[in-house]
């Protein structure tokens, strides 16, 4: 009995993640989180998109700002945040992404450049549209985020789904992310719509909660 009581006492002090509710927010089904928490973390410092994506994810799960302590060692320490890798075909990864979000769990996604036609600048990019939260809804802004390199790509925290997404016919553009490159713009929350054919299927495409 004494041992059981000690175990229960120790467990009481362990961090407990909770699933975040997926709710419609001005036309985007977004995991619930305190906007001020994400804004306080802000945009990434150079080369640390993976760490910042992890911090956003843990902040959503824990309901408090994640400092990122112990989650970086010349690269993101996924296990320190309770995340593990998931690989598969593009269709399998997108289905996993959908199911994780539906269960209230943010997913870290690895992006690569894709070539976009019909644009004058930055034909190779990881995204095109971002949405700034205002008092009256989302302002759509054309702001291409360029992957830092073809070697490392770019990591984002996916936290939203289009309300029109078909679970049996998913594409990257059905999902919305907290992008470490621009999670805040002029003091407002910004979410980025993923661009089709940017999921880096061949190179650690997803990190999911273990």
For each predicted feature, which ranges?
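Aromatic- and glycine-rich peptidoglycan recognition patches
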Residues: 156-159, 173-210
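Active-site-adjacent structural segments surrounding the nucleophilic cysteine of cysteine proteases
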Residues: 14-79, 133-148, 170-172, 185, ...
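Solvent-exposed loop/turn segments at secondary-structure junctions
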Residues: 44-47, 56, 72, 89, ...
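Post-signal peptide N-terminal regions of Sec-secreted extracellular proteins
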Residues: 21-27, 83, 87, 106, ...
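Active-site-adjacent substructure of cysteine-protease-like catalytic cores
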Residues: 92-178
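Bacterial N-terminal signal peptides
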Residues: 3-12
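Substrate-binding cleft of extracellular glycoside hydrolase catalytic domains
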Residues: 70-96, 101
């Amino acid at each position: 009995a004494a041992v059981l009581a000690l175990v229960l006492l120790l467990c009481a002090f362990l961090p407990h993640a909770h699933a975040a509710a997926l709710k419609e927010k001005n036309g985007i089904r977004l995991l619930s989180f305190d906007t001020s928490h994400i804004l306080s973390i802000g945009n990434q410092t150079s080369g640390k998109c993976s760490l910042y994506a992890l911090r956003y994810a843990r902040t959503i799960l824990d309901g408090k700002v994640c400092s990122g302590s112990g989650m970086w060692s010349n690269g993101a320490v996924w296990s320190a945040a309770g995340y593990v890798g998931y690989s598969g075909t593009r269709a399998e990864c997108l289905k996993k992404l959908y199911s994780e979000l539906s269960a209230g769990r943010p997913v870290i996604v690895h992006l690569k450049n894709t070539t976009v036609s019909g644009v004058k600048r930055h034909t190779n990019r990881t995204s095109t549209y971002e949405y700034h939260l205002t008092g009256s809804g989302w302002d759509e802004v054309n702001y291409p985020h360029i992957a830092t390199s073809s070697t490392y790509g770019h990591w984002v925290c996916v936290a939203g789904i289009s309300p029109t997404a078909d679970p049996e016919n998913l594409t990257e553009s059905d999902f919305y992310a907290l992008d470490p490159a621009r999670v805040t713009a002029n003091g407002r929350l910004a979410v980025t719509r993923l661009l089709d054919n940017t999921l880096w299927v061949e190179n650690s495409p997803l990190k999911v909660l273990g």
